[in-house]
Amino acid sequence: MKDIFNFFEKPKDPLSFSAIRISLASPDKIRQWSHGEVKKPETINYRTFKPERDGLFCAKIFGPVKDYECNCGKYKRMKHRGVVCEKCGVEVIQSKVRRERLGHITLATPVAHIWFLKSLPSRIGNLLDITLKDLEKVLYCESYIVIDPKETTFQRGELLSEDRYQKALDEFGDDAFSAGMGGEAVLGLLRGVGPASKEHGEGIPGLANELRAEMKEATSDAKRKKIAKRLKVVEAFVASGNKPEWMMLEVIPVIPPDLRPLVPLDGGRFATSDLNDLYRRVINRNNRLKRLQELNAPDIIIRNEKRMLQEAVDALFDNGRRGKTITGPNKRPLKSLSDMLKGKQGRFRQNLLGKRVDYSGRSVIVVGPELKLHQCGLPKIMALELFKPFIYNKLEEKGYVTTIKSAKKMVEKERPEVWDILDEVIREHPVLLNRAPTLHRLGIQAFEPVLIEGKAIQLHPLVCTAFNADFDGDQMAVHVPLSIEAQMEARVLMMSTNNILSPAHGKPIIVPSQDIVLGIYYMTRERAFARGEGKVFASPEEVRAAYDQGEVDLQAKVWVRMDGKRVETTVGRVLLYDIVPRRLSFDAINKVMDKKQLQGLIDLTYRLCGEKETVLLADRVRSMGYGNATRAGISIALDNMVIPRKKVDLLERATREVDDIQAQYTEGLITIGERYNKVIDIWAQVTEEVAQEMMGEIGTETAVGTGKDGKREERRQPSFNPIYIMADSGARGSAQQIRQLAGMRGLMAKPSGEIIETPITANFREGLNVLQYFISTHGARKGLADTALKTANSGYLTRRLVDVAQDAIITEYDCGAMDGITLGALVEGGEIIEPMGERILGRVALDDILDAFSGNVLVKANEEIDEGRVKLIENSGIDKVKIRSVLTCQARRGICVECYGRDLARGRKVNIGEAVGVIAAQSIGEPGTQLTMRTFHIGGAASRRAEQSTIENRNAGLIKFNNVSVAKKHDGTLIVMNRNGEIIVTDDQGRERERYGVVYGAKLLVREGQKVEANQLLAEWDPYSMPIITEVAGRVKYGDLVDGVTISEQVDEITGLARKAVIASKDPDARPRISIKDEEGKTKKLANSDADARYMLPEGANLVVNDGDEVDAGDVIAKMPRETTKTKDITGGLPRVAELFEARKPKEHAVISEIDGVVAFGKDTKGKRKVVITPEVDGKLRPDLAKEYLIGKGKHISVHTGDRVRAGEALMDGAANPHDILRVLGEKELARWLVDEVQEVYRLQGVKINDKHIETIVRQMLRRVRIVDVGDTEFLADEQVEKFAFEEENERVLKAGGRAAQGEPLLLGITKASLSTESFISASSFQETTKVLTEAAISGKVDYLRGLKENVIMGRLVPAGTGLGAYKHLDIEVETPVDAVEEAEEALAVGAEE
């Protein structure tokens, strides 16, 4: 490995090295780099502006200020190149060496490098086993430290105060032991680091052996952890070959002067880089210290000077890390070397990862309705500027000019020849258009420029969705790809016509929107009594002729013979069929075409006819849509907002219901929380009903006309109300917004997210009164504030995702994985949310998929499941399929083609080299920003579903109960007494049609084996509270329910009634409970076990029964109020997604069972309840294998004695903890849970993302294992290692006949995972730069430049896509353009003749 500083000699080709290593620099190394010592703090002479000799800008050390000219002016020009001037000592050479030559400062005393001292954990402290506090005392000259105790009783590394040191000198004499303070002492200690006893060897390797031995003997966990930490640092030194004393600085490098320039301003002042100030401080203090040492000054003065020097060096390396921040004259902290690297403005992110580009311009965009999909309009003036070099070249080639200078003049005069040449230059030369923020790869696309007058760029309307652009003043940037390779990539990979499908979900992203949809929708609608209704035509051509002649209307219903069949259709649809590819059947468009249908049409065309046809179709649809939208002449008038007639009655009814509930509350029948929830529900329901009435009235109309027999006739038909048309077609607006215009605005949310219980009953058409307007402003403002915040949050989420997934690249065809995941339909609450077909499309089958009945192979193992095969699978009635997945891919680096499956943006299997990690990150991050930007459109109107409190079946069939235990009340009703019971509806053959989970405390309205009709009520429950129910009849006895201690009687101010609620008590032994006694006062036993009928009450439970009441089995004895619902919005969303990907532990997470078994309660300890789960083996309970869990007092335990629980099931209420799921259920279950949870957030917003993207991120989060048992491997206990490194090391040890290490899978959040990547360059450019670099330097890390980020930073091509190693040797041959043009012209001529 070459020394990196040879970089500074001549610019190297970035491809000439394959890895880069970082390590500590020794003092000799620094002197070797240096071109001379900087002795004086002076910079330049302010009169002559010449650099001072031996100063910070010295020309002798760093090189001449002007090219080939020495300082005193004796030697000038090229002919003296390489001479060293004997007068001023300057070498005659180019001045740019001042950007690469280093100097050095020799320090009078060694100084600690602050990174290794203060970056936690302190490396120097760890190595010497001294605490940071003590270390600082020594370094900043406050205490002495024993370096060599010799014969005395001191320990090596012991601290002595001034008094103690003097006493010891008196006691033992001067030579009896050596102690010191300041840098020299620490340097001495570091030089002598080694084991306590000689048996382990010498120096650092000896120390490592000793620590390993100690670790084997260590008894306590804490001690083992401490040793492991120290061992980690020691091992790093052993492995890297760094010497510990190099963490102390004896020589400091001075960076080249042109990297810390001094610029004269007008008025004789100078602007300088902060580094010069920091270096000046160091030199001043160093020189002063040298002088004091020569003068033999008193100890105390020298000590003070040493401390100041240490502080000055600290500030130079990392200002503000320790002590006071050093500020400049303007009270601004000085920017130290570390600050140059850190943060968004640091070297990494500002200059290495993002650079400014030449050949670019930006301008406002306007719509270009007549452009083809692959074109964009480029203003002539812009094109002239961007393509200048090409124009100069052509002008010279054609002989118009002889020199570049004259070419320049010609272009400036804008002569006619220039415009001709410009036309020729830009023909077929694609340009890239980019709209900021670029949230996914479709934010940059390539187009062929068309020259236009004016100053605005014209954009094709169909690509607006991808860019998220609109024409209200958006700007876009244009970039010119210069090289042939770049042009080729732009054309093949980035052309807008090659990006029809979205990489996020694989559906078209080039879809008609707004006016286009409106026009197509309008032309495919049918209008009653239109001119020419009922006519019959022999062919589509006849229809067209009749329409052109004005014989039939666009929306008239007619009969036409199509492909030999008579079809009933409308004129508009026949005209639309004219532009659709012939492969598509007429049925595909013989319906009202709204936005969804149009997306389906484009999708279908893409699958059946390919890319080219799709592009042509898109352009034709665009033109036809715009044309018909114009002809439709749709406008909005006040009268179009139809307020439903029934609104008044509905509102009156709701007010009455609310009054009833208020009355119930006043009588004390319900709690304040239930009242609030019920009121909210009533209003939510009424708002819905008003909206439905309104949509009903606005959505249909009665058409009057003359029937066939000439009589007046009325017909109902879908309305032609413009507002309805816009919403129904999907062009603009939603039912939600129309509701606010013409229905009622409904419930609003407070900024805290609670719902205000008085809704806004008015709509915008009627107008709001002052109070209503005021309530509205709440929501609207919150929307705007949220938008600003969430955009930033979302961007940050995307950045973290990209960082963690940037090295997930497709690297091989097949990893040979034998494992996969099982996918079925996604069902929630008995409804199929996502059918299985959608989830398995484009994946690769793991095993043969067989038809359940015939046993035929539908899909072979390792075949892609495409649209056709999905149909086969769905028709065969298979409900679960095993597929290959990124999660189980065995590729050592990256991912293999088979496990990934289809590249969604191309609709075929993924290519090798595709950067699927980045695509996944963009697909997840992009909608985050979209959603955040879209919150305020509804103006904070609260959207909330009425709580589900019943189960209805959708299909008729037979009822079957699965794991349902019930209590029968005396009136015969059945109450469900456990939590994980299910009601299953089966058909006559006994096949399961649907399945519903039933809640604890629900009232069953059906019995086992009962026949039910469709949509029958099966069960109902109280949605607002969780009941605690007794299983036996008897008399209530309170236990530990003491007023004011464990229960409080709260008297309601409004109703004056008292209600008892359990409160948290100070007494740790109090166990509030209710027991059920029999006549003799003995506690009753539960029916199915020998446990007592005792019910523990969690905090917050409301008591429903009094002491001594008689109760029946199935009665409610206490209620737990459920939280009042907050509005569901992506606010729950974005932070939720971040929380999931960061793998945070929820605050109040549920304890889950680690085994299957039967629940029992043990003795309480320390005020916590003990739940014991006993497993069954072969039908027998095995108490020896039981697991115990302690659950905090006041938490609601959701299992009961005798319940059977499965592993991974929650024992109490609370959020799931992903780390628990991983530990108990394993990686696949965790991955499934994460995918479902993330998807749920996006689904609420109607955003589609393919599962495989989330899986890709989860794979990156699960890359590591934690070592539990080291075996004979090189690992340390509790160390986190990459999975594959772990497997390789184990293989090595097993081959040698040793014992393998044991590890447990580890789930890292995305930030942690990014920081722990193998590449230190990538990690340091992400976050915590200094920490990452400190660690990397000590362990002498090597970065093999495998990820994308490291390569961008090193200025190489990324190892993905066309930059992949496999494609490196391909060269592109260019035909001379002249031949190509001639060939093309010949071909055209031949084509024309044919």
Swiss-Prot record:
It is an enzyme of class 2 (transferase). GO terms for biological process: DNA-templated transcription. One of its GO terms (molecular function) is DNA binding. CDD domains: RNAP_beta'_C (cd02655), RNAP_beta'_N (cd01609). It catalyses: RNA(n) + a ribonucleoside 5'-triphosphate = RNA(n+1) + diphosphate. Mg(2+) binds at residues 470, 472, 474. It comes from the Bacteria. One of its GO terms (cellular component) is DNA-directed RNA polymerase complex. Pfam families: RNA_pol_Rpb1_1 (PF04997), RNA_pol_Rpb1_2 (PF00623), RNA_pol_Rpb1_3 (PF04983), RNA_pol_Rpb1_4 (PF05000), RNA_pol_Rpb1_5 (PF04998). Its cofactor is Mg(2+); Zn(2+). Binds 1 Mg(2+) ion per subunit. Binds 2 Zn(2+) ions per subunit. Zn(2+) 2 binds at residues 815, 889, 896, 899. Its EC number is 2.7.7.6. Zn(2+) 1 binds at residues 70, 72, 85, 88. Gene3D superfamilies: 1.10.132.30, 1.10.150.390, 1.10.1790.20, 1.10.40.90, 2.40.40.20, 2.40.50.100, RNA polymerase II, clamp domain (4.10.860.120), RNA polymerase Rpb1, domain 3 (1.10.274.100). SUPFAM superfamilies: beta and beta-prime subunits of DNA dependent RNA-polymerase. The RNAP catalytic core consists of 2 alpha, 1 beta, 1 beta' and 1 omega subunit. When a sigma factor is associated with the core the holoenzyme is formed, which can initiate transcription. Belongs to the RNA polymerase beta' chain family. NCBIfam families: rpoC_TIGR. DNA-dependent RNA polymerase catalyzes the transcription of DNA into RNA using the four ribonucleoside triphosphates as substrates. This is DNA-directed RNA polymerase subunit beta'. The lineage of its organism: Bacteria, Pseudomonadati, Myxococcota, Myxococcia, Myxococcales.
